[in-house]
């Protein structure tokens, strides 16, 4: 069966004057009713899967949005604001940590992997249905994320990368096929992509994933 995932609520938040990811994190902590109103508009469409309003749960991202040391509070608030709407499925979105990554350096790989492990640990005692790794643009970063999550959790993982119409990743480094291979090898339950390609190109990308 096809499941509909909620759309990002950032546009609704912008209309409410909440522009940046820093403002979104702050609003979630101190003004959750604003986030709830954005979700209320989204639930009119009836999505079965609702996604956390923020995705900045790695230590590096928490620092970037001005929420250093507030990871647990942010995680609890993100799930609490969605619980009111009783979604069929709850997805915890985790965005790329943004740290430099040298795929030839073990220290760099471990540092990045542990970013995602620490993000996943925030949800170890929480109730949700799956992690949603979203917005990734390199297979190496995605690999670190999958390894980090698998280090601390056996929860299902949905993974998505940004892809160009020709099958190259949005960063210009690596391909969609390579990303799918990483997803399969490191335990993603669902492989997905986001693209600005034409419908025919998107269909070709989906076919390529099935063939990989």
Whereabouts are the PLM-identified features?
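Domain-level signal for soluble alpha/beta catalytic cores
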Residues: 1-212
């Amino acid at each position: 069966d096809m499941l509909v995932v909620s759309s990002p609520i950032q546009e609704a938040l912008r209309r409410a004057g909440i522009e940046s990811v820093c403002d979104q994190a702050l609003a979630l902590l101190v003004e959750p009713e604003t986030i709830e109103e954005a979700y209320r508009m989204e639930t009119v469409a009836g999505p079965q899967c609702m996604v956390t309003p923020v995705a900045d749960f790695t230590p590096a991202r928490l620092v970037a949005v001005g929420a250093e040391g507030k990871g647990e509070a942010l995680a609890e608030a993100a799930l609490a604001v969605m619980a009111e709407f009783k979604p069929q499925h709850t997805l915890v979105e985790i965005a790329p940590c943004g740290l430099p990554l040298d795929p030839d350096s073990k220290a760099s790989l471990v540092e990045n992997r542990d970013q995602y492990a620490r993000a996943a640990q925030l949800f170890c005692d929480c109730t949700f249905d799956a992690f949603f790794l979203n917005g990734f643009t390199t297979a190496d970063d995605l690999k670190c994320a999958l390894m980090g999550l698998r280090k601390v959790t056996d929860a299902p993982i949905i993974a998505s990368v940004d892809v160009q119409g020709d099958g190259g990743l949005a960063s210009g480094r690596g391909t969609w096929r390579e990303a799918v291979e990483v997803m399969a090898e490191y335990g993603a339950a669902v492989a997905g992509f986001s693209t600005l390609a034409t419908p025919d190109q998107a269909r070709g990308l989906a076919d390529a994933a099935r063939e990989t």
